[in-house]
Design a protein with these regions (language model features):
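Residues within the DNA-recognition helix of helix-turn-helix
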Residues: 13, 34, 142-145
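Internal acidic/polar
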Residues: 69, 77-104, 124
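DNA-recognition helix of helix-turn-helix
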Residues: 64, 68, 132-156
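Structural recognition of an alpha-helix C-terminal capping motif at a helix-to-coil junction
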Residues: 19, 33-40, 44, 53-65
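Residues within helix-turn-helix
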Residues: 29, 126, 137
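A short, charge-rich alpha-helical start-of-domain segment used by transcription regulators
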Residues: 1-19, 32, 43
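A short pre-motif secondary-structure segment
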Residues: 114-118
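Arg/Lys-rich amphipathic alpha helix in sigma70-family domain 2
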Residues: 47-50, 60-82, 93, 145
Length: 162
């Protein structure tokens, strides 16, 4: 793959890949690692794509697979997050500490991913199923359960604002 083409694809799809990786991991560092690995695989494999949407779907599928690999890695199972170890947590980035975004980030990973792809990337249930390697019924179930959890979280916090 030519350098210019790789740079164009990073420019065109890098943010979508990052957002999915962040939705899956809730960690900026892990998301950045996944983005890097995704585009390295693109350059190494140089697959042929029918169109830009096919390329985007391929990149998101690879990113989802990389996130799964991260969760299954022996290193990941041995380490504990700093928050669990009693270290101070970093301040929330502006805008992520309130409302719906914080509620989405508080969801379990399997729900964060489908919510992100459905609402933020505007993908269909069929596209999400393909990218995450799930059945369409599973995606619909996860979307429904995620919406219920979000509704409960957001309704529980409405009365706490001054």
């Amino acid at each position: 793959m030519e350098r210019e083409e790789a740079e164009r694809l990073v420019e065109a799809h890098g943010q979508a890949v990052y957002r999915l990786a962040y939705a899956r991991t809730a960690s900026r560092a892990d998301a950045e690692d996944i983005v890097q690995e995704t585009f390295l695989r693109l350059v190494r494999q140089s697959p042929e794509f029918r169109d830009d949407e096919h390329c985007r779907a391929w990149l998101l599928r690879v990113a989802a697979n990389c996130a799964g690999d991260l969760f299954r890695s022996p290193w990941r199972r041995r380490i504990r997050p700093l928050e669990e170890a009693g270290a101070l947590t970093a301040p929330e980035p502006e805008g992520e500490g309130d409302g719906a975004v914080a509620a989405v980030l508080a969801l379990p990973e399997r729900y964060r991913a489908v919510i992100h792809l459905f609402y933020y990337e505007e993908m269909s249930v069929a596209e999400i199923a393909s990218i995450l390697g799930l059945r369409e019924g599973t995606v619909r179930t996860r979307l429904s359960r995620a919406r219920d959890k979000l509704r409960a979280m957001l309704e529980g916090t409405e009365g706490t604002h001054v």
